[in-house]
Amino acid sequence: MLRRFAVIGNPIAHSLSPVIHQMFAQQTQIELIYEKILGDDVKFEQQISDFFIQYGNGLNVTLPYKKRAYELAKIRTQRCALAGVANTLWMEENQLHADNTDGIGLIRDLSRFLELKDKKILILGAGGAARGIIFPLLEAKPLKLIVANRTLEKAEELKRQFPQINVTSFAELPEFFDLIINATSASLSDQVIALPEEAFSHKPFCYDLAYNQKTSTAFVQYARNGGCEAVDGLGMLVEQAAEAFFIWNKVMPSTQKILEHLRSF
């Protein structure tokens, strides 16, 4: 029986999710269609309702609707509740369920490059993207997890929810890290957060949650210019998609060849 999925966001034309899920479908021999839905700021909640009334099986949610999707759900997973935003929706026993697969997607992609246990990790930014990855990063048992933000007040809000983290401003960063994660939206507008030179002195591995399939993101290029190994978030996109696919279809697809295929363009 043909299963129906979609991703909703605004903008949405650039989304790689349909390509990724179709490759998962071919690999697992599951018949499905996966569409793009342009979100309507006024009618978003109605769009969600209509999708499931019309026998939709699962829905991915991207910017700027993750918070509204979270609030719409009746049942949320623990990691979704901690993130405060949702990117994966489905109906079960006539109730809307929500999960957030971004964090586990990040951890699985990072594991290709380095071990997180006992590492000193810096997250740039204290918005929704940062909030969604803190819990899974803490589960990996780093030595220290520091969140830096332009305004300290926003970082302090995160510390109230996650007392284990340290917070600082961009201007007062400690001297070295093993891993720097860019969770700001700067790369989306081709800008970078200028960091003190000392931040790169230990040659940390650098990771941008944003991705650009055709060229390096601004942060990745900035980090490489500082002598660091750096990658964008395309791998995270594929891994979070695999987790959503598993939630909906109870089959975990393989991701490595799909990521290699997407990187080859």
Curated annotation (Swiss-Prot):
Q: In the UniProt record, does the keyword NADP occur? A: yes
**CDD domains with a match to the protein in the record:** NAD_bind_Shikimate_DH (cd01065)
For binding NADP(+), which residues are annotated in this chain's numbering? G125, A126, G127, G128, A129, N149, R150, T151, L152, E153, K154, L209, G233
Q: Pathway, per Swiss-Prot/TrEMBL?
A: Metabolic intermediate biosynthesis; chorismate biosynthesis; chorismate from D-erythrose 4-phosphate and phosphoenolpyruvate: step 4/7
Q: What is this enzyme's EC? A: 1.1.1.25
Kindly state a single biological-process term from the GO annotations of this entry: chorismate biosynthetic process
Q: Keywords, A to Z?
A: Amino-acid biosynthesis, Aromatic amino acid biosynthesis, NADP, Oxidoreductase
Q: GO molecular function terms here?
A: NADP binding; shikimate 3-dehydrogenase (NADP+) activity
Q: Which residues are recorded as binding shikimate?
A: S15, L16, S17, T62, N87, D102, Y211
Q: Name one Pfam family in it.
A: Shikimate_dh_N
The main enzyme category here is oxidoreductase
In the UniProt entry, which residues are flagged as the active site? K66
Which catalytic reaction applies to this protein?
A: shikimate + NADP(+) = 3-dehydroshikimate + NADPH + H(+)
- GO CC annotations on file: cytosol
Subunit (UniProt):
Homodimer.
As for what it does, the entry says: Involved in the biosynthesis of the chorismate, which leads to the biosynthesis of aromatic amino acids. Catalyzes the reversible NADPH linked reduction of 3-dehydroshikimate (DHSA) to yield shikimate (SA).
Q: Which family does the entry's similarity section mention?
A: Belongs to the shikimate dehydrogenase family.
Report what the protein is called: Shikimate dehydrogenase (NADP(+))
Look up and give the organism this protein is from: Legionella pneumophila (strain Corby)
